[in-house]
């Protein structure tokens, strides 16, 4: 299993003082040196953490894989086509939320989604949809033109706090198995941390996990290099 490191909260920390440090690009390069297989950043519509300049600099610097998380808007589509990350992940977005609260509603946006994805597909940019671990969502993601799906693990993380993860883990496992069986690649993310990541080693269909907040929080105490390496030890 591979690790993609989300560096959004390096930018959050920088923006808290309106300064230049810490630098998200420096964090991305360090994560890569420590074994991360990809770097994730979310260019939100309100630019609350990652800024346009950060994205441009990340595109120049990242040598593994750059995964741009974004909402389905014309502005961000143009930015993606110009920047050409290896992967874009479409996520739902609400201005009032602290973090992404759920999976993309593929059924609701299906007709528009197919048209939105076409120029990205045509320009060689792989597309992932951040979805709930449900068979219908997986089917629609494939039909819309996604190359892979990122299964939303937020409810699993919430259940972990309640010591009640079995049903949600089974739902994720079944969705991953089904997605793989119909030709989609599978990754997972949201709320994963050093306590709850272990069971994902037993789901071979999930090829990568995307983790940000837990790693950045651990890095405050251990340093980013050790935080990344510790997570890699847990997933490999």
From Swiss-Prot:
CDD domains, per database record: PNPsynthase
Metabolic or biological pathway, per its Swiss-Prot or TrEMBL entry: Cofactor biosynthesis; pyridoxine 5'-phosphate biosynthesis; pyridoxine 5'-phosphate from D-erythrose 4-phosphate: step 5/5
Residues the record lists as binding 3-amino-2-oxopropyl phosphate: 6, 17, 191, 212-213
Keyword Cytoplasm recorded: yes
UniProtKB keywords: Cytoplasm, Pyridoxine biosynthesis, Transferase
UniProt EC number: 2.6.99.2
GO cellular component labels: cytosol
Reactions catalysed: 3-amino-2-oxopropyl phosphate + 1-deoxy-D-xylulose 5-phosphate = pyridoxine 5'-phosphate + phosphate + 2 H2O + H(+)
Positions with a binding annotation for 1-deoxy-D-xylulose 5-phosphate: 8-9, 44, 49, 99
Top-level enzyme category: transferase
Compartments (UniProt record): Cytoplasm
Coiled-coil ranges (or none): none
BP terms from Gene Ontology: pyridoxine biosynthetic process
Active site: 42 (proton acceptor), 69 (proton acceptor), 190 (proton donor)
Molecular function terms, GO-annotated: pyridoxine 5'-phosphate synthase activity
Family named by the database record: Belongs to the PNP synthase family.
Record NCBIfam families: pdxJ, PRK05265.1-3, PRK05265.1-5
UniProt subunit comment: Homooctamer; tetramer of dimers.
This protein's name: Pyridoxine 5'-phosphate synthase
Protein source organism: Chlorobium phaeobacteroides (strain DSM 266 / SMG 266 / 2430)
Name of the encoding gene: pdxJ
């Amino acid at each position: 299993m591979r690790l993609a490191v989300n560096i959004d909260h390096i930018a959050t920390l920088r923006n808290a003082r309106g300064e230049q440090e810490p630098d998200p690009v420096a964090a991305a390069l360090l994560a890569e040196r420590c074994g991360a297989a990809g770097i994730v950043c979310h260019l939100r519509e309100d630019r609350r953490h990652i800024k346009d300049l950060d994205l441009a600099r990340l595109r120049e610097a990242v040598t593994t894989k750059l995964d741009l998380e974004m909402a389905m808007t014309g502005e961000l589509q143009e930015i993606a086509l110009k920047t050409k990350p290896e992967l874009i992940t479409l996520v739902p977005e609400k201005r009032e939320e602290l973090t992404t609260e759920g999976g993309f509603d593929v059924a609701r946006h299906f007709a528009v989604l197919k048209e939105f994805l076409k120029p990205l597909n045509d320009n060689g940019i792989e597309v992932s949809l951040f979805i709930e671990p449900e068979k219908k969502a997986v089917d629609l993601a494939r039909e819309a033109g996604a190359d892979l799906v990122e299964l939303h693990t937020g409810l699993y993380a919430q259940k972990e706090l309640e010591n009640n993860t079995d049903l949600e883990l089974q739902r994720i496992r079944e969705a991953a198995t089904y997605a793989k069986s119909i030709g989609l690649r599978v990754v997972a993310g949201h709320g994963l941390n050093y306590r709850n990541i272990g069971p994902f080693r037993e789901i071979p269909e999930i090829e990568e996990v995307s983790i940000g907040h837990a790693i950045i929080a651990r890095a405050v105490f251990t340093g980013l290099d050790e935080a990344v390496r510790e997570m890699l030890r847990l997933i490999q």
